[in-house]
Amino acid sequence: MTNLQDQTQQIVPFIRSLLMPTTGPASIPDDTLEKHTLRSETSTYNLTVGDTGSGLIVFFPGFPGSIVGAHYTLQSNGNLKFDQMLLTAQNLPASYNYCRLVSRSLTVRSSTLPGGVYALNGTINAVTFQGSLSELTDVSYNGLMSATANINDKIGNVLVGEGVTVLSLPTSYDLGYVRLGDPIPAIGLDPKMVATCDSSDRPRVYTITAADDYQFSSQYQPGGVTITLFSANIDAITSLSVGGELVFQTSVQGLVLGATIYFIGFDGTTVITRAVAADNGLTAGTDNLMPFNLVIPTNEITQPITSIKLEVVTSKSGGQAGDQMSWSASGSLAVTIHGGNYPGALRPVTLVAYERVATGSVVTVAGVSNFELIPNPELAKNLVTEYGRFDPGAMNYTKLILSERDRLGIKTVWPTREYTDFREYFMEVADLNSPLKIAGAFGFKDIIRAIRRIAVPVVSTLFPPAAPLAHAIGEGVDYLLGDEAQAASGTARAASGKARAASGRIRQLTLAADKGYEVVANLFQVPQNPVVDGILASPGVLRGAHNLDCVLREGATLFPVVITTVEDAMTPKALNSKIFAVIEGVREDLQPPSQRGSFIRTLSGHRVYGYAPDGVLPLETGRDYTVVPIDDVWDDSIMLSKDPIPPIVGNSGNLAIAYMDVFRPKVPIHVAMTGALNAFGEIEKVSFRSTKLATAHRLGLKLAGPGAFDVNTGPNWATFIKRFPHNPRDWDRLPYLNLPYLPPNAGRQYHLAMAASEFKETPELESAVRAMEAAANVDPLFQSALSVFMWLEENGIVTDMANFALSDPNAHRMRNFLANAPQAGSKSQRAKYGTAGYGVEARGPTPEEAQRAKDTRISKKMETMGIYFATPEWVALNGHRGPSPAQLKYWQNTREIPDPNEDYLDYVHAEKSRLASEEQILKAATSIYGAPGQAEPPQAFIDEVAKVYEINHGRGPNQEQMKDLLLTAMELKHRNPRRAPPKPKPKPNAPTQRPPGRLGRWIRTVSDEDLE
């Protein structure tokens, strides 16, 4: 973030470290300028699961020191038992004096099984509680989920094998360094004496007040009577002190008091015990003071303390059984936790509870804590420290992002797999130049984009040192061509060269540069400092493109622009190509600075911003438009570009504007429209078309030529966009030559633009074209060569053929190929390609073509019946079906075109049920059940057939019902004893009857008459 020389990536290291602590530490970019060193400290613990299989891990995610948390196991009696504290690998107070926590993340999961266990069982609940540990009322496994209502601060029932990740997010900023309680030099009689310097910043003070004139009364007992004078919740994991005094009054002589303070841990056990008074005698009739002055160092606090208790033991000197003892007490105590009110020290806390894990399993806690550390004087001799860098833009951006963390899906507890998946999203958040693709998928892009616009540019007006950062993020990078390329105000001067939407009819200068200057894509290098055609040029490098933001749900049409230069009057040179978008309205804020302020008027008086102001645009538009360069396009959004492209003109842009004015789409149309494609034999420059084609392919777009004639169909954007939803790359050659969805006015506008004098060819180019046409008319061989050239270019194999020619200089391989190629109509040709002509593969229509032909057939049939509203587009929207009877009734009654797929139930009469006769049902059942001559169908099957006739209102079964009836018949035949007996099979050994045969063709039968 602070390295402003790298203009291609603007990373905010602080927020990257916050969201992904494993990427390492980063200095907090606030105004606390202390020399420090950055350090990452790991924490790794393998915690053994207790007998009940349940436990609780308490994390202090924001604690600025070595303490990370504590582990408790659940006992069979339902109580928690402290196991151990969780610390960083290095004891920071041993080497460092001061500390600031930058970021921290911890992961809890289990991947090991004890002996005899073959499945990894158990689940985890986790919650971040915006309070202190002592304030939790229910720490049971399920009760933790009620600790907060914020869905981003709790997760439940995560498998222990998957694990959870705890992320530390700051609750405050611009914090000072905290003293770590490090040892200080000290000399004493006791060699074990330790002196430490504890934090005194932001202490937390608990005040405990005894009720005035608290009355105690009891009878004497041997050993004294013990009562709890008070018990209060406190929170402490660092050193604390207790101060104050209590006043006791009594009227009984010889009373003796003893007082003890107990510091109790989260599990209810006593951690520290301090005797305040022992055998303290009370004087009757006076105020007896009992002072409290305790100091508990950090090293004695072996587990988190959550409460304090004061017990008083009352006895009597020489007391006898039955003697009365009474006194009253008043006063207050103050418990001070050193550094306890530092943001993150004691609150919030994150609790991770696991349940039903196999006994003896190991739960692993692993994580990293990143710190800013100030070493002690001894270590500072060998450790280099640096000042923190003040970066208000980065700090402001971080604050705004985390203030919207609930809306941006940034949680404090995560399933580990989900957190890993979100790392790419976090990288987008940390990179101010990222296009926010993943954020857009989650729906967070608008918020982050608004934060970027607010957080960084405003800073330059308050803090001048941050102005370069503001320009880089807000208004765009000043593309530095050198010192002379900027005016006194710091604003880059615009170039006078013009980018043109180049086609076969246009050859215009894009970047004004003399010979000797090398212009390659966006890299502009010059050897000296001349002024060329108004461009101030100086030694230097034109810096790379910087993406603006994405525009969501914006209708747009796209077209390519070829960036050219001119070496001489006849040979324009294509250098690069860029996709532009036509957006409705005045949207100069989306344009790069090099395009702003330039516009052209249309014939209807409207403006097109981003066009060069050359005359009048020969189009009639109904509104203003803006053309902007883009770097990428998605389903419903476009990513803008900051490339320093000057204003443009050209046929491709005019065609895209015409489409935009007619269709007015709600989302970008994923087709690159260009005027460089045609089918009339016009000579085209190969490099221009290839450059546009490559540019369209990089974005996954089709390169579409204009419709060359008017089609009598109305504009139907829904049908148009339905045909091209996924933009395959195999439609590159004139896919829209016969576009049936081009409305008449768009065609007329296109022809008007092509006929305008402004878009005629240059005289030199016209002369060259006429010369080539004349040569082709005179020389048939040259005409054939031009045809071959156009065929190669149209099919996109110019480069392939050129490479083939280099490998076959004598054309031997080509001659052999042509000699052995199948001829039109030959057997091999028909076997391979069907009956199509030579070299043309005979194929059936594509599904889209077949569907379109079907829609046309239905429409023509409806037209013959006088139903003129059923156009092919209407049929397509109606589910590729003709109008239903209800739609026809609606049209006949209202003479309004019915909406496709509308039922219009009000125009349909209820269908009368027609009952089939029993004879008809029996005949159908017999026909379905079996062949004639077999046994009659059973009554159960006849009933099934009758049900079908009843459902169909007297009509017979449809195909699906017929299948069901046939299956039913087969089942009944197999289990019906009344089925017809099988036909007897012929016996193989039985003699066959001799058929009456003829004696012969020439043998005459002797009759009785002959014998007479």
Curated annotation (Swiss-Prot):
- Bias category Basic residues: which stretches? 975-986
EC number(s) from the headed UniProt entry = 3.4.21.-
Name one process (GO BP) from the record.
Answer: proteolysis
Task: Quote the catalytic residue positions.
Answer: S652, K692
Q: Where is this site: Cleavage?
A: A441, F442, A487, A488, A494, A495, A501, A502, A512, A513, A755, A756
- Coiled-coil intervals: none
* Residue stretches making up the Peptidase S50 domain: 513-755
User: PTM comment for this protein?
Assistant: Specific enzymatic cleavages yield mature proteins. The capsid assembly seems to be regulated by polyprotein processing. The protease VP4 cleaves itself off the polyprotein, thus releasing pre-VP2 and VP3 within the infected cell. During capsid assembly, the C-terminus of pre-VP2 is further processed by VP4, giving rise to VP2, the external capsid protein and three small peptides that all stay closely associated with the capsid.
One GO cellular component term: host cell cytoplasm
Q: Where does a divalent metal cation bind?
A: D30
Keywords, A to Z? Capsid protein, Host cytoplasm, Hydrolase, Metal-binding, Protease, Serine protease, T=13 icosahedral capsid protein, Virion
Top-level lineage group: Viruses
Region: Disordered, residue numbers: 969-1012
InterPro entries linked to this entry = Birna_VP2, Birna_VP3, Birna_VP3_dom1, Birna_VP3_dom2, Birna_VP4_Prtase_dom, Viral_coat
Which stretches does the entry tag as region Interaction with VP1 protein?
A: 1003-1012
GO function term, MF aspect, one: serine-type peptidase activity
Task: Return the broad EC class.
Answer: hydrolase
Protein name (record): Structural polyprotein
